Curated annotation (Swiss-Prot):
Pfam families: Herpes_UL25. Its main location: virion. Heterodimerizes with packaging protein U64. Interacts with major capsid protein U57 and triplex capsid protein U29, essentially at the pentamer vertices. May interact with large tegument protein U31. Belongs to the herpesviridae UL25 family. Plays a role at the late stage in the encapsidation of viral DNA, assuring correct genome cleavage and presumably stabilizing capsids that contain full-lengtht viral genomes. Located on the external vertices of the T=16 icosahedric capsid, may bind together the tegument and the capsid through interaction with large tegument protein U31. This is Virion-packaging protein UL25 homolog. It is found in: Virion; Host nucleus. Keywords: Capsid protein, Host nucleus, Viral genome packaging, Viral release from host cell, Virion.
């Protein structure tokens, strides 16, 4: 065997010695190095797989949360779109298209009930309030349906106003009042207040030269000037008229009481509007109301009696006096025209409206006087 040692063992180990089968010979150190590198790459692959798994789990969680949020926002958007669609169903007269699926279950099926069925929305996104004939009356009746619910007060001013109602024998009999705290008084006051607000908030704001308060002050100044020893002259301003309102309202109350003594039914604060009238804009040439609109109003009767107004075009209650001849002549002979010109000239110059022609100023001024007089009485 000693002769074969040189075949298996060389004195100097050759590097990359050719093998008999043409295979490179690797040392154990190289093999260990290759194994270490393979293990390291495998470990990196495993770590990368774990990281990808964690990222996919986190992405799935975020996508689930985003899906839930989008679903919630979509539901809210659909509800808003449904409310907007319901609001757009209103016509100019406040009617609603009753063929929608959402309202189909809430609307009476029979034609007889459907003709009497109406609904009103306060704001576009609120549910509808349904009523049968009169929304205002049914709402007020609902408020005062249960006496046990009314355990509060509006203050001393409301009690004083109820006392005025209770002290009127005619109202006490008509409303069947037994005590001043009767809910019938509060019910009637609320109805009167709503009616007054309705009249005070529908006047046109386009092309108006003066406000309803300014129109009221012009009428009151003309009324006050008809009394002897009145404290107004050509230097009087609108502010001066406001300071004189307590004195003017005392005289106004005396005139109304005198008219009431002559005719108990003559103290009517209202206008004879046609039944087909929808807006308080004068429809006759854009300036005049229908005939006899002012016919029964107590303030008109009082102004005519004091000579503040000579004639209202088309009215049967006026005197046979043609004010047209005085409009461009001696203007001082017409008291209302004169004081309107005196008080509004600093603001409007020569473009001062004449109330008997631009009658929406006359009407808005009368309604403002009613409101101011009511506040003074309270």
């Amino acid at each position: 065997m000693a002769q074969c040692n040189l075949f298996y063992q060389y004195p100097i180990t050759p590097i990359l010695e050719g093998h008999v089968r043409n295979i490179l010979i690797c040392t154990e150190k190289d093999v260990e190095k290759l194994q270490s590198q393979s293990s390291l790459r495998l470990r990196e692959k495993i770590d990368q797989g774990h990281r990808d798994k964690l990222l996919r789990m986190r992405l799935k969680t975020e996508l689930d949360a985003l899906q839930k949020k989008m679903q919630k926002d979509s539901d809210v958007l659909n509800s808003h779109l449904k409310a907007i669609e319901d609001a757009l169903l209103f016509t100019n007269d406040g009617e609603v298209n009753v063929e929608t699926k959402a309202d189909a279950q809430l609307i009476p099926k029979s034609p007889e009930k459907l003709e009497k069925f109406n609904q009103v929305a306060i704001t576009p996104l609120d549910p509808f309030i349904r009523f049968t004939d009169d929304f205002r009356g049914e709402m007020i009746n609902t408020f005062f349906n249960n006496a046990q619910m009314w355990n509060f007060t509006f203050g001393s001013w409301f009690y004083k106003l109820k006392r005025v109602f209770y002290n009127e024998p005619g109202l006490r009999r008509a409303l069947k009042l037994t005590n001043v705290d009767s809910l019938t008084i509060s019910k009637e006051l609320l109805a009167v207040t709503v009616n007054a607000l309705e009249q005070a908030t529908v006047y046109p704001i386009f092309g108006s030269e003066m406000s309803d308060l300014e129109a009221a002050l012009c009428i009151l100044a003309a009324f006050y000037s008809t009394y002897e020893n009145s404290q107004i002259d050509e230097r009087t301003t609108l502010v001066d008229v406001i300071t004189l309102l307590p004195v003017i309202f005392r005289l106004l109350g005396s005139e109304i009481t005198a008219l009431k003594n002559v005719s108990p039914s003559g103290t009517y604060f209202g206008f004879n509007d046609p039944s087909c009238m929808k807006f308080f804009v004068p429809m006759r040439k854009g300036k005049h109301y229908a005939e006899n609109t002012f016919g029964n109003h107590v303030l008109i009767k009082m102004l005519l009696g004091r000579g503040v107004m000579q004639k209202i075009p088309g009215e049967k209650i006026s005197q046979n006096f043609d004010v047209e001849a005085r409009l461009h002549g001696a203007i001082k002979n017409d008291v209302l025209v004169y004081w309107t010109y005196q008080l509004m000239r600093p603001k409007l110059g020569n473009n001062v409206p004449i109330f008997i022609h631009d009658q929406h100023y006359l009407r808005s001024g009368l309604v403002a006087i009613e409101s101011l007089f009511l506040l003074w009485r309270i």
